[in-house]
Amino acid sequence: TNISSTIELDGDHYVINGEKWWASGVGHPNCKFLIFMGVSNPDSPKHQRQSQIIVPYDSPGIKLKRYLTVYGADHAPHGHGHLEFKNVRVPKENIILGEGRGFEIAQGRLGPGRIHHCMRIIGLAERALELLCKRSLNRKAFGKPLAELGGNYDVIANCRIDLEMARLS
């Protein structure tokens, strides 16, 4: 709800000003449209101030400022970008579901996305724990497998506990 970008009605068009961070796929040659979220109703209740609108990527006033890295990985040109919008005019028919519905739309998408990413990360953590257990049985130090040296049981047990807590939260 803390958005400073604006979407203002001007006749038969909306005028967009602001920036969009983490615009996925903006460098891909097939990227032709963007979904922009900005404040359209500043005097409305907090969760009804924003709207979302479809913006043709080739609209005058859109500038790709830079590509963004994720955890140090550069996914350019197909990854995420930082875009600037200056007086971008879009037909009013491009508004999605009507003015003031942007937050609602965003929440409808973010909820399932969060669940997806949690499941994916828990799966990766399970695999990492499996590899840790195998290594503790196969890697020898001081003539014994690491698992028999005692100090590794609590590490493995704590990993299992953390994983189960993540699964339940």
Label every PLM stretch briefly.
Residues 1-3, 32, 60, 81, ...:
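Short beta-strand or tight-loop elements
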Residues 5-8:
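A structural signal for short hydrophobic beta-strand segments in well-ordered beta-sheet cores
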Residues 12-13, 17-65:
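A short core secondary-structure module
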Residues 63-165:
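Glycine-rich beta->alpha junctions and the first turn(s) of the following alpha-helix
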Residues 169:
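A contiguous, well-structured pocket-lining segment that forms one wall/lid of small-molecule binding clefts
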